[in-house]
Amino acid sequence: MVKHSRGNRTRSRKLLKKSPRERGAVPSLGRLMLDLKEGERVVIKINSSTHSGMPHRRYQGKVGTILGKRGKSYEVKVKLGDKEKILIVRPEHLNQIKA
């Protein structure tokens, strides 16, 4: 018997699927150059066509706050159960919440 692999994208067939209109589209320049301030609230929306800076699928749809910037990525604090996690996520995978 062969041991079944459990990679980072297992069980994500529907979760990371794009709609036919979005398929093949690369993130727009505005989305890549998104300037987020510390303390802003964001939603993690994974863009499956960009692999760098992609958070784990368990964080898809979670709301977090920006702690700071680390290189091209942002540090995002997310509450998961009763714990708080700090993720390092690229801006392609973040959506700003309009206040």
From Swiss-Prot:
Biological process according to GO: translation
Lineage, uppermost ranks: Archaea, Thermoproteota, Thermoprotei, Sulfolobales, Sulfolobaceae
Species this protein is from: Metallosphaera sedula (strain ATCC 51363 / DSM 5348 / JCM 9185 / NBRC 15509 / TH2)
Recorded GO MF terms: structural constituent of ribosome
Cross-referenced InterPro entries: Ribosomal_eL21, Ribosomal_eL21_arc, Ribosomal_eL21_CS, Ribosomal_eL21_sf, Translation_prot_SH3-like_sf
Gene3D superfamilies: Ribosomal protein L21 (2.30.30.70)
Protein name listed in UniProt: Large ribosomal subunit protein eL21
A Gene Ontology cellular-component term: ribosome
UniProt biased composition (Basic residues): 1-18
UniProt xrefs under SUPFAM superfamilies: Translation proteins SH3-like domain
Extent of the signal sequence: none
Keywords on record: Ribonucleoprotein, Ribosomal protein
Family: Belongs to the eukaryotic ribosomal protein eL21 family.
Region (Disordered): 1-26
